[in-house]
Amino acid sequence: MSYADSSRNAVLTNGGRTLRAECRNADGNWVTSELDLDTCIGNPNGFLGWGMQNFSHSSEDIKLEEGGRKLTCRPKTVDGGFRERQGIDLNRIQNVNGRLVFQ
């Protein structure tokens, strides 16, 4: 299940690099969890992609939108400019018993 369906109070920390949310665990309790998005999202020439790394090193104005379901930013291109705002659906981030996990 997408983390957004079983979590609350999602925010970005560390300059947009870290997703933090309160996630419901199997016992029904709310547990604070964090996921370093630089371990699973990259920026290949101005577009965000899964299964890559370090998007935050080459992006600016990183935000959560749509109630935490989407991450947007202005990624840098190989020529050094910044592309218009790009987004990636965070549906690959799951809440696994109170932990944010990339799947």
UniProtKB/Swiss-Prot annotation:
What Gene3D superfamilies has UniProt attached to this entry?
Answer: Cyanovirin-N
Annotated keywords: Lectin
UniProt keyword annotation of Oxidoreductase present? no
Query: What drives induction of this protein's expression?
Result: Down-regulated by nitrogen starvation.
Q: Pfam family of this protein, just one?
A: CVNH
- Top-level lineage group: Eukaryota
* SMART domains linked: CVNH (SM01111)
Q: Please verify whether the record's keywords include Mitochondrion.
A: no
The record's annotation in InterPro entries points to: Cyanovirin-N (IPR011058), Cyanovirin-N_sf (IPR036673)
- Please give one Gene Ontology molecular function term for this protein: carbohydrate binding
What PANTHER family does this protein's entry cite? CYANOVIRIN-N DOMAIN-CONTAINING PROTEIN (PTHR42076:SF1), CYANOVIRIN-N HOMOLOG (PTHR42076)
What this protein is reported to do is described as: Mannose-binding lectin.
Family statement:
Belongs to the cyanovirin-N family.
Q: What is this protein called?
A: Cyanovirin-N homolog
Q: Which organism is it from?
A: Tuber borchii
Q: What is the lineage of its organism?
A: Eukaryota, Fungi, Dikarya, Ascomycota, Pezizomycotina
